Each structure stands twice: as C-alpha cells, then as structure tokens.
Amino acid sequence: MTTRNDCLALDAQDSLAPLRQQFALPEGVIYLDGNSLGARPVAALARAQAVIAEEWGNGLIRSWNSAGWRDLSERLGNRLATLIGARDGEVVVTDTTSINLFKVLSAALRVQATRSPERRVIVTETSNFPTDLYIAEGLADMLQQGYTLRLVDSPEELPQAIDQDTAVVMLTHVNYKTGYMHDMQALTALSHECGALAIWDLAHSAGAVPVDLHQAGADYAIGCTYKYLNGGPGSQAFVWVSPQLCDLVPQPLSGWFGHSRQFAMEPRYEPSNGIARYLCGTQPITSLAMVECGLDVFAQTDMASLRRKSLALTDLFIELVEQRCAAHELTLVTPREHAKRGSHVSFEHPEGYAVIQALIDRGVIGDYREPRIMRFGFTPLYTTFTEVWDAVQILGEILDRKTWAQAQFQVRHSVT
C-alpha cells in the first residue's frame, strides 16, 4: 500500500514541483477543483494593478495603442494555440464558451447548408455540458429550418448515431461529469466520412491533456481559460476554426471588432479575413490581461510533462480511494484507461453533495455535480502527491464517521 512517505518521495522527484510557487494557494487548503476554477497565479495581482493603475489610470485611452490592448485577443490566441495544436493566427481569446459555441455552430450549419442542405441533425451527448445543449437547442429553434438534436446516451453509441442526416457532430472532448476523454481524431474522421463537420469543446482539455487540432482534423474548437489555464473567474474563452473553413462564411455576431476596417466606421459590415472575424465587441481588457499570467506558467513546461503527472496523480487518487474507502458506497465513474481519462476523477456516492461539503469544511475543495457525482480535479502545475494522500485520508475519516450527515452539510448552496 502506498504510504505518505512514498508520496513525499514522489514530490521530491517531481520536475514540475517548482511551478507550484507561482500560484497563490491558501495555507491549510488542498485544492482539487482546478477543473472548475484554476488557482490564481501570483503574478496576476501585480498585473491587474498595472493594468488598472498604469495602463488605464495613466495611459487612459492611449493604451489601446501604447499598451497593445487592441490586439490582445489575437496575441493571447497565439500563445494558447501551442497548447491545442493550432498555429499562429488561428485562435482568438474572446467572449464566453457559450457565445463562441453559438458562433461556430451557426457557421458550421451555414457551411453545411451550402454543401448538403438536406442535413438537419446535430449529434451530441445527453451528458454534454448543459450550456452546449442549450445553445444548440436555442439556435435550432431560432433558425426554424428543421434542425434537431440527436442525443446519444453513451460514447459507444456515437458511431451509430452519426449518419448521412448529420450536419454537425458537437462534442466535449473530456466529459465534465465523468472525465471520459473521446478519441478526437477517430470521431472527427468518422464525422467527415459521413459528410458532417466536427465541433470540439475543449473546456476540460486545454491545459489538462495534449490536444492537436490539426492532427485530429478538427473543424471548429472552443474552450474556456478559467479552469486549467488559470485565467481567473469568468475569464474569456477561446475559439479556433480550421483555416479551410474560416473564411467560407461570416459568423453571426457581426460586431465592430470583427470588421476588416474597424475604424473606417463604415455603415455595412465586412468581416475580417481569418480568425479575427470571430471577434465581436470591445474586449474586457482587465480580465484578458489575467489570462496571460496563466499562460506565462505554461510557457515554462510542456503538455507531455503535464500529462504524465496528471495520470500519475489520478492513478494515485483512484488507488488510494479504493484502498482507504473500500467499505463505503463509492463507485468510480471515471475511466481507468489512460487513453480515455482526462485530468479529473469522479466518484458517485448516495450522499455526494453532503460529502463534498464536509470535505470543504476540512479544507479539501472538490465539487459536486448532479446526480451524486463528486468531482476531484488534479492540476499538475500545483497539485502534489502528498496532497492526494492527505485528501484521501480526510475523505476516509468523513465517510467512517458519517460526518456528512450533519445538518450543516445538507444545506444546498446556489453553486455546487
């Protein structure tokens, strides 16, 4: 059985361990929720102060030029591109994941309407993140052209669900509940064989697992920066479009930042060439600047190293939970196979919500998703092996003593 000393030894050998010092982590907290909101980079505080006091305070409107505000979305996109297998000039950091999905799904359906107008099906998973389903449903309803969602209940059913009626396959690479990771390349190839376009949501992938959009042959990708990329609460999302598709159609939110001649102030819209056309309105500079602090840390390592540690952390967590908590009603819902696992681990428990609240009370922060799913995120930039060991011991104590049954842990908060 793995001991705490074994975990201390793993931490001593961890080449990524020094990066933890670049994050502001509270004393007495084991943070296993970076899959929901990443920790604050230490540099973010000074960067925010510089943007507010210097660039805004002293530079005023001049900072759109002198501080490079105008091109910040594109510059950040170029830096983020290296983490997802994209190239310079193919990614912009802007808006929210929901808004960017609306843009790319609209564009994909418009492309398909010119190629195969008879296709009216959007294939996705029942367990996809709800906002993705809501956006697709709302767009289909708005278009009033007979588009329908075909919801698939398990990954194994996807190959049969994608057929000649499919216009778009819209999937999240790593499932937000289970941590199941799709084979992006295989499913994209299958989509293309059937004449469909593939949209990938990388919310739980970017900064967590290696992604190569070009190698996978993907058509569109979106994702957020506030999880593993540590961009801060509500930080801007990103959007990528295959160069073969990018200029075929305009995206529907034709704001002035996406205009080819923004300050010509022309009465009619003319989209920029390339990914800049996926910009819309004026960018939130203070928040965007925080994204760069997170990307600065990633520039000091590589995704292969992060993936190795992620798998080691999640392997250890699964092993320890199944040893320490074997007598309790815990069911692993995350795949054991490395090729199918993201960077978070989920266990089901009948009192999952209350257990998570009791853990938080003890300084171990995970989160809860309906129904009965306890999620634990492992961020290789700052999670240690010893923290994994300590967290499992605390979980075991809570289950042994039924601490979760206390009334205070039954109270439902608005955010779980």
Curated annotation (Swiss-Prot):
Reported cofactor(s): pyridoxal 5'-phosphate
Binding-site residues, pyridoxal 5'-phosphate: 97-98, 129-132, 172, 201, 204, 226, 256, 282
Modified residues (N6-(pyridoxal phosphate)lysine): 227
Record keyword Flavoprotein present: no
GO biological process, one term: NAD biosynthetic process
Catalyzed chemical reaction(s): L-kynurenine + H2O = anthranilate + L-alanine + H(+); 3-hydroxy-L-kynurenine + H2O = 3-hydroxyanthranilate + L-alanine + H(+)
CC annotations in GO: cytoplasm
Database matches in InterPro entries: DegT/StrS_aminotransferase, Kynureninase, PyrdxlP-dep_Trfase, PyrdxlP-dep_Trfase_major, PyrdxlP-dep_Trfase_small
Enzyme type, top EC level: hydrolase
Pathway where it operates: Amino-acid degradation; L-kynurenine degradation; L-alanine and anthranilate from L-kynurenine: step 1/1; Cofactor biosynthesis; NAD(+) biosynthesis; quinolinate from L-kynurenine: step 2/3
Molecular-function GO term, any one: kynureninase activity
Keywords of the record: Hydrolase, Pyridine nucleotide biosynthesis, Pyridoxal phosphate
Enzyme Commission identifier(s): 3.7.1.3
One family name in Pfam for this protein: KYNU_C
Annotated consequence of substituting residue 132 to A: Reduces binding to pyridoxal phosphate and strongly reduces catalytic activity
Keyword Transit peptide: no
SUPFAM superfamilies tied to this protein: PLP-dependent transferases
Family (UniProt): Belongs to the kynureninase family.
Quaternary structure (record): Homodimer.
Record-linked NCBIfam families: kynureninase
Function according to Swiss-Prot or TrEMBL: Catalyzes the cleavage of L-kynurenine (L-Kyn) and L-3-hydroxykynurenine (L-3OHKyn) into anthranilic acid (AA) and 3-hydroxyanthranilic acid (3-OHAA), respectively.
Protein name per its UniProtKB record: Kynureninase
Organism encoding this protein: Pseudomonas fluorescens
Gene that this sequence comes from: kynU
